[in-house]
Amino acid sequence: MKRYMFGTLPRVQPKRCFQTAIGKESPKGNSEKDQLFENPFFQQLPSNVAAVYLNPVKFNPSENDVLCASLKIKSFETPKLDTFTDFICRTAYYMKIPIKGPRPLPNKVESWTLLRSPFIHKSSQENFERITHSRLIQLYSVNPVTLETFFSYLRKCNMWDLKLQAKAYEYESIDDALKNFESQSKSTDNFKELLNGPSKKDIITQNAEKLLRNDPIYKDLLKNSSRK
């Protein structure tokens, strides 16, 4: 199923899929977009149903927008992959999230060579191949709460044979970054002290001596041993 943007399209020959209800094709001078809007069946559709036949509308990020997250969608089948990327773009539009994409990424090709059979055909081999298709969508200037809601909704509506891989980016001031760095350095120093400190045996002996010193019987034994 083809999708069309609201903008201008090059003039092409009419196709059968956009025939009118009578069965006659529209004039050759009209573009496919004009043929679609002139179709009486398309004109009777509700706006939410008619939007399925068009490309999803997107909020394009400006130069001042900051990259907040990137989303990769992977699948072994391109039809379901394209369908779900279309759904993601529409979801981002209704949540007012500026996005870039979907951009196709290089395919990952995996191949295996195995024995055809352990008995009769063990001398012959058979090749197996698996191709992973992926798309990339980048999200800009999103509130963290909105981004979390967006990802949770996609997880809820995800198809069973698709894999979603998301990366979120957080930006902070230099002062906050220095404070976090100092706190992390202190925690590492404490960890090093624990590693370089006394062993478990030494700790046990120290605690045992503390307990014995408070015991009156042990004190009497120490006094008697010192007198001798």
Swiss-Prot record:
Transmembrane segments: none annotated. Residues 1-17 form a transit peptide. InterPro entries: Ribosomal_uS10, Ribosomal_uS10_dom, Ribosomal_uS10_dom_sf. The keyword RNA-binding does not apply. NCBIfam families: rpsJ_bact. Belongs to the universal ribosomal protein uS10 family. Component of the mitochondrial ribosome (mitoribosome), a dedicated translation machinery responsible for the synthesis of mitochondrial genome-encoded proteins, including at least some of the essential transmembrane subunits of the mitochondrial respiratory chain. The mitoribosomes are attached to the mitochondrial inner membrane and translation products are cotranslationally integrated into the membrane. This is Small ribosomal subunit protein uS10m. It comes from Schizosaccharomyces pombe (strain 972 / ATCC 24843). The lineage of its organism: Eukaryota, Fungi, Dikarya, Ascomycota, Taphrinomycotina.
